[in-house]
Amino acid sequence: HLTADIDPLGRPRPGLPELDPAFYDLTEEDMDRVFSTDTIEGPQSMSLRQIIRRLHNTYCRSIGVQFMHMDDLLVRQWLQVRMEGCENRIQLDRKQQLRIYRQMTTAAVFEEFIQKRFLGSKSFSLEGSESLIPLVEMAIERGASQDIQDVVMAMAHRGRLNVLANIMRKSPQRIFREFADLDPELHVGRGDVKYHLGHSTDYVAENGR
């Protein structure tokens, strides 16, 4: 995770000697030698070059993962199998890609509107983390396919308004009225800041559940 490509500015970072094969006296001649890969998800044996490529694709691209400090071996193995099995990439068809694109665009437009329309108001923007919206919806859809009927969400301030609007289907009009202090209920006994308010909705998944 220390070498994962997660810096959008691409700033240079010092190398880690222990991640260089030469640190273990391995040379270019060793790259095509075949090794047992019992501790890596996938084929039972691979060349050193394939092992390095697979681990790099899994742990050193745009997703960084730090989990080896966990005490529970079964949890570590569970994570390892699921990440290394697909190299931390899921295959999305064009329909899914377009859906994610629309969700992220909607999330970004929502944040931009609030920032421009309610200048100076605290909103704990989701800006920079818009991928949370398709991720949460994907989790809910997956749950629906596993016969889960109820989902209860509890989250911190950051991104909460966006989740209320784009996941919980809370009316943006209602959210904006709350920002403008036009909702009379906010002044009758239960007043609270906008990013503390919740919502309940009936979510219909793609499978109709």
Task: Label each residue range with its predicted role.
Residues A4, P8, P21-A22, A107-A108, ...:
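A sequence-composition feature that detects small, non-aromatic residues
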Residues V152-R209:
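Cofactor-binding active-site loop characterized by glycine-rich and histidine/acidic residues
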Residues Q97-E111, L132-S145, L186-A205:
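Structured alpha-helical segments in the cores of large, soluble enzyme domains
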Residues S47, I51, Q96, I100, ...:
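Generic hydrophobic, aliphatic-rich segments that mediate packing or membrane embedding
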Residues H1-L132, I148, E185:
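Extended, charge-enriched "interface" segments that sit outside catalytic cores
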Residues F113-Q173:
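Active-site pocket-lining segments that scaffold enzyme catalytic pockets across diverse folds
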